[in-house]
Amino acid sequence: MSTDLRTHVLSEHHVSRETAASLDLYVAQLTRWQTVKNLVGPATLKEVWHRHIADALQLLTVAPEATRWLDLGSGAGIPGLILALAGKERPGFHVGLVESNARKCAFLSETARLTGAPVTVHNARIEAVIGTLTDTEIVCARALAPLSQLLAWTEPLLTSGTIGLFPKGRDAATELTEAEDEWTFTRDLIPSRTDSQARIVRVTSLSRVDP
């Protein structure tokens, strides 16, 4: 891990000393659990501050006022657990983490306990719990599914005022075109701060295309 890269990420996102300590603990936990549970791509662990932490933190710059977040398919806690650590000093900040894999949920729960992250871990399939989480302001998911599937899962939220933030790679335009065959929505493509070819797809006002 590059100390210079860590310092750059913390400075760019104005991370407090206390939050930096929590993120360091998260990285230590991720490294320890990676040896027994493949939480992230092994090559990306060497670039964790850029590939994962900075990539997650940039979502806060897109929705700086939001305090009620939901992360689908949380896995290693990216971006949800990282967002919770960055926001835990803010009153009322909370992130729901939805993950169907029990061992990944064990990682999320233990790391949240050690870091004091303001999260609720939902060990369940998305479709089983999404309808009960309608107080969500922002729903996000990274590297989980094509956009059309994400919209299908989040329909109960995005039709009721919740904003979707979905980081996508170079296929973002293709996924948007495919999604527009089934859905009508307002969208913005926000350039990623960590990958010049990636975009954050911001979705609001979702409805199904009339048959």
From Swiss-Prot:
It is an enzyme of class 2 (transferase). It holds the Pfam family GidB. Its main location: cytoplasm. It is found in: Cytoplasm. GO terms for molecular function: rRNA (guanine-N7-)-methyltransferase activity. The keyword S-adenosyl-L-methionine applies. Keywords: Cytoplasm, Methyltransferase, rRNA processing, S-adenosyl-L-methionine, Transferase. S-adenosyl-L-methionine binds at G73, I126, E127, R142. Its EC number is 2.1.1.170. GO terms for cellular component: cytosol. It comes from the Bacteria. It catalyses: guanosine(527) in 16S rRNA + S-adenosyl-L-methionine = N(7)-methylguanosine(527) in 16S rRNA + S-adenosyl-L-homocysteine. Specifically methylates the N7 position of guanine in position 527 of 16S rRNA. Belongs to the methyltransferase superfamily. RNA methyltransferase RsmG family. This is Ribosomal RNA small subunit methyltransferase G. It comes from Methylorubrum extorquens (strain PA1).
